[in-house]
């Protein structure tokens, strides 16, 4: 009985530790160095995939909402 309980607690602790590890997107990729084209490496799109999260929109894009703290959702101008 005690062995089953200890095993359960051990597995629960391992699961809790694994859940706390950040994924690739949350591990700092949002704030990585810009690509040669000037775009920042962001991990998500916005507006159902019709926009990109950027710090500044390009000339042919317009801001269409916010993604995160200092990021704008930029969509192509029509």
From Swiss-Prot:
- Record's superkingdom? Eukaryota
Protein's cellular compartments: Secreted
Q: Keywords, A to Z?
A: Antibiotic, Antimicrobial, Defensin, Disulfide bond, Secreted, Signal
Under InterPro entries, the record lists: Beta_defensin_dom
Leader sequence segment? 1-27
One biological process GO term for this chain? defense response to bacterium
Q: Which cystines does this chain contain?
A: 43-74, 53-67, 57-73
Cellular component GO terms held in the UniProt record: extracellular region
Keyword Hydrolase in record: no
Is the keyword Secreted in the record?
A: yes
What is this protein's function?
A: Has antimicrobial activity.
UniProt protein name: Beta-defensin 105A
């Amino acid at each position: 009985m005690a062995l089953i309980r200890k095993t359960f607690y051990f597995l629960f602790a391992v699961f809790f530790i694994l859940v706390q590890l950040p994924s690739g997107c949350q591990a700092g990729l949002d704030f990585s160095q810009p690509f040669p084209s000037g775009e920042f490496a962001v991990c998500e799109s916005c507006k159902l995939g019709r926009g990109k999260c950027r710090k500044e929109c390009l000339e042919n894009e317009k801001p269409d909402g916010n993604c995160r703290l200092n990021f704008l959702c930029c969509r192509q101008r029509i």
